[in-house]
Amino acid sequence: MTTPSMEDYIEQIYMLIEEKGYARVSDIAEALAVHPSSVTKMVQKLDKDEYLIYEKYRGLVLTPKGKKIGKRLVYRHELLEQFLRIIGVDEEKIYDDVEGIEHHLSWNSIDRIGDLVQYFEDDSKRIDDLRSVQKRNEQENQ
């Protein structure tokens, strides 16, 4: 079972490896705005829990278990960003909102949000209809 903090690290490590081909402690620390010693401590825990293999001074690699979870965490994050965009959340608020909610939703809720995103994306008229409702509500609330 992963904690929200473990998920943040696994997600960031997965993204760094996808982007650069590797993830160093210093890269992870910079991306998460934490001290390198905190990264080392968490990486050792993730190694112990078999999410990654860490060798001091040699770097780290995700295990198949770590890759699977990392991929799912990135999917969750991107899906929630899509969802908030569809429902009209201001772009500059989306990242922080996703960070605030992503660890508090069950995977069942994430799957249902995925269904809703697909529903809207399957027919752009649905998004237009939503925008009309939002516009009408804004006018009524003024």
UniProtKB/Swiss-Prot annotation:
GO terms for cellular component: cytoplasm. DNA binding is strongly activated by Mn(2+). PROSITE patterns: HTH_DTXR (PS50944). The keyword Transcription regulation applies. Its main location: cytoplasm. InterPro entries: DtxR_MntR_Metal-Reg (IPR050536), Fe_dep_repressor (IPR001367), Fe_dep_repressor_sf (IPR036421), HTH_DTXR (IPR022687), HTH_tscrpt_reg_MntR (IPR022897), Iron_dep_repressor (IPR022689), WH-like_DNA-bd_sf (IPR036388), WH_DNA-bd_sf (IPR036390). GO terms for molecular function: DNA binding; DNA-binding transcription factor activity; manganese ion binding; protein dimerization activity. Mn(2+) 1 binds at residues 8, 99, 102-103. Coiled coil: none annotated. Keywords: Activator, Cytoplasm, DNA-binding, Manganese, Metal-binding, Repressor, Transcription, Transcription regulation. Mn(2+) 2 binds at residues 11, 77, 99, 102. Residues 1-63 form the HTH dtxR-type domain. It holds the Pfam family Fe_dep_repr_C. Central regulator of manganese homeostasis. Belongs to the DtxR/MntR family. Homodimer. This is HTH-type transcriptional regulator MntR.
